[in-house]
Amino acid sequence: YTVRARYLVGADGARSKVMEDLGLPLEGQLARAATAYVFFRADLSRYTAHRPSSLYWIVTSSAAFGEIGMGVLRAIEPWNRWIAGWGLDMSKGEPDLSADEVTRRVRLLVGDPSLEIEIDTTSIWYVNQAHAPVYSKGRVFCGGDAVHRHPPSSGLGSNTCLGDAFNLAWKLAFVIKGHAGEQLLDSYSLERAPVGAQVVARANQSRLDYGPLNKCFRDPSAADPVASGLAQLSDPGAEGAARRAALADALDLKQFEFNAEGVELN
């Protein structure tokens, strides 16, 4: 069938066909890093019910690869439905996401070698650091994840998409109703593209800010860097005190991700 319209809005996500067909460029890098995710069911109440959270970061040698360098458990339905994730080395090609390997990985993250899990789905998620410098061409306008592609760090995605939608919607309404000329629509890219670029930079910086945390949890000179680094955090001497002070500073840096109010309000 055919639909005729005066304007078209492409808000079709990070794999936008509208962006592709329109030929709008992206600046930055797509798929600069990768994470394996598994959606699974298991009763973890004995490990989590007394310390409830939505996210659990797990420091272990089995999940020490990548910028974050930690495994993650995300509670979907406490305390039986979960998403587990760990960094991937993209240079090694497609990862092994067989049931046996995924079960082994989840058990290592949880720390329970006999944990029974039911795997629902597995997937690979890629970290993007890219934005469109221009959001429109002619009578076609793009917005949302189509024009700013970034990780969820700092929780900036939904707010930014809503900001795009609000900015474009009232302008389209004014033009269509005859309250303003079409020149008003030129301001959409001018106002929103800088916000998209800023959000992409901030979200990716929030991932990079895990670097100082990783250093606190690791001793590069040891056979097991993570085990040795964690042990040194409890050292009663000067070295342990210095490592704990560095950890406090590294945790404070994460305020920009979890508690800051700023760029997400643009």
What are these regions (language model features)?
Residues 1-7:
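Core beta-strand elements of the Rossmann-like FAD/NAD(P) dinucleotide-binding domain
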